[in-house]
């Protein structure tokens, strides 16, 4: 019997590219990957939609379809690259692009765009999307969803493990070795989002390559302490956040007109990410075990070095150790979530999101081949 194949799609809070992964399960194997750059104009529209200002409905509708088309084209490129027919794909799992994540209001909501109808129509492949809102409807945060996949992939009774996904926002998963204990996961706060935004504003570069610019600056201790005093960092899980909360306006408010050398701000923002993560790791009182890194931030050598220092005695590694490059783990996660949905299995963990119960997540947009 041929192995089942799924495709995972993600555009994270960093908005640098669309990540696509073609995955085979039982056992899990990545067949091919493809990163599709987001065109400048589309990225500009996405950034505008994801800020705290009011935006027009026509702009959102047009961007939704444009992003869906880009996702669909990225899938076709991936299939061509892998020399695989669309008929052999069970489903696509598409996270979309988050433009609002507001889990704590009177009527909590989260909104991801990247029209799955367009993806299914372009590719002919059944597409599963809108994974977060069912969890929210059950009283959960709708995020993070990755811990359920981390549990499937990395839980091990030989040691306690922490999985840190450093995207625009960083999220941490605790996988206890004790099978009687529940997995815990939450957003720790900013990952790359402030680093990238500050770099773009000051150097006109999308990101600080390997953290070299930050490494040349001096950490401003008083400012780090002020930033870490933000109430979110003291809030116990379940919790989740986004760039609606942690953005340049938040940073400027904390700077309060005080002037710093831009490179020192970059160094301080790396320290904010590293210390906020390390503080969360300490809460698990682990005197041994490992911290596994994934996401784009795993390529920031300066940040990784700070985590190694601050998170001792944990062994710090990356998901490369199990054969999955850190850049692709989240895309693989959404391929797995699509599989869970089509197999009528839950995709959330109430111990992570705070939902009343586990649930089958997502909506299904049928392709040309109806297997279910």
UniProtKB/Swiss-Prot annotation:
The species this protein was found in: Coxiella burnetii (strain RSA 493 / Nine Mile phase I)
Recorded metabolic or biological pathway in which this protein acts: Amino-sugar metabolism; 1,6-anhydro-N-acetylmuramate degradation; Cell wall biogenesis; peptidoglycan recycling
Superkingdom of this protein's organism: Bacteria
Gene: anmK
Residues reported to bind ATP: 12-19
Keyword Transferase: yes
GO biological process, alphabetically ordered: 1,6-anhydro-N-acetyl-beta-muramic acid catabolic process; amino sugar metabolic process; peptidoglycan turnover
EC numbers: 2.7.1.170
EC class (word): transferase
InterPro entries: Anhydro_N_Ac-Mur_kinase, ATPase_NBD
Listed Pfam families: AnmK (PF03702)
Protein's recorded name: Anhydro-N-acetylmuramic acid kinase
Transmembrane segments: none
Catalytic activity: 1,6-anhydro-N-acetyl-beta-muramate + ATP + H2O = N-acetyl-D-muramate 6-phosphate + ADP + H(+)
Keywords, in A-Z order: ATP-binding, Carbohydrate metabolism, Kinase, Nucleotide-binding, Transferase
Family of this protein: Belongs to the anhydro-N-acetylmuramic acid kinase family.
Function (record text): Catalyzes the specific phosphorylation of 1,6-anhydro-N-acetylmuramic acid (anhMurNAc) with the simultaneous cleavage of the 1,6-anhydro ring, generating MurNAc-6-P. Is required for the utilization of anhMurNAc either imported from the medium or derived from its own cell wall murein, and thus plays a role in cell wall recycling.
């Amino acid at each position: 019997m041929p192995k089942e194949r799924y495709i995972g799609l993600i555009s994270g809070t960093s908005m640098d590219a669309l990540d696509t992964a073609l995955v085979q399960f039982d056992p899990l194997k990545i067949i091919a990957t493809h990163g599709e750059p987001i065109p400048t104009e589309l990225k500009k529209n996405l950034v505008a939609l994801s800020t705290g200002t009011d935006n027009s409905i026509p702009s959102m509708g047009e961007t939704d379809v444009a992003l869906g088309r880009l996702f669909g084209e990225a899938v076709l490129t991936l299939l061509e690259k892998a020399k695989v027919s669309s008929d052999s794909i069970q489903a696509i799992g598409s996270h979309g692009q988050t433009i609002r994540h507001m889990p704590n209001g009177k009527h909590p909501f989260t909104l991801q765009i990247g029209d799955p109808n367009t993806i299914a129509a372009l590719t002919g492949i059944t597409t599963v999307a809108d994974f977060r809102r069912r969890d929210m409807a059950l009283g959960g945060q709708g995020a993070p969803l990755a811990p359920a996949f981390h549990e499937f992939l990395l839980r091990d009774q030989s040691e306690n493990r922490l999985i840190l996904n450093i995207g625009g926002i960083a999220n941490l998963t605790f996988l206890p070795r004790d099978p009687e204990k529940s997995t815990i996961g939450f957003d720790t706060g900013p990952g790359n989002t402030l680093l990238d935004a500050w770099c773009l504003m000051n150097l006109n570069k999308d990101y600080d390559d390997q953290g070299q610019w930050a490494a040349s600056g001096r950490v401003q201790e008083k400012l780090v302490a002020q930033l870490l005093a933000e109430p979110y960092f003291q809030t116990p899980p379940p919790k989740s956040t986004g760039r609606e909360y942690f953005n340049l306006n938040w940073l400027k408010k904390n700077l309060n007109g005080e002037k710093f050398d831009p490179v020192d701000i970059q160094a301080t923002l790396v320290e904010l990410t590293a210390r906020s993560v390390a503080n969360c790791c300490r809460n698990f009182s682990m005197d041994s075990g490992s911290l596994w890194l994934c996401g784009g931030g795993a390529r920031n050598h300066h940040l990784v070095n700070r985590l190694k220092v601050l998170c001792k005695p944990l062994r710090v590694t990356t998901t490369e150790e199990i054969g999955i490059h850190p850049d692709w783990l989240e895309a693989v996660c959404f391929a797995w979530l699509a599989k869970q949905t089509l197999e009528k299995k839950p995709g959330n963990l109430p111990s992570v999101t705070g939902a009343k119960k586990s649930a089958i997540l997502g909506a299904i947009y049928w392709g040309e081949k109806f297997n279910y």
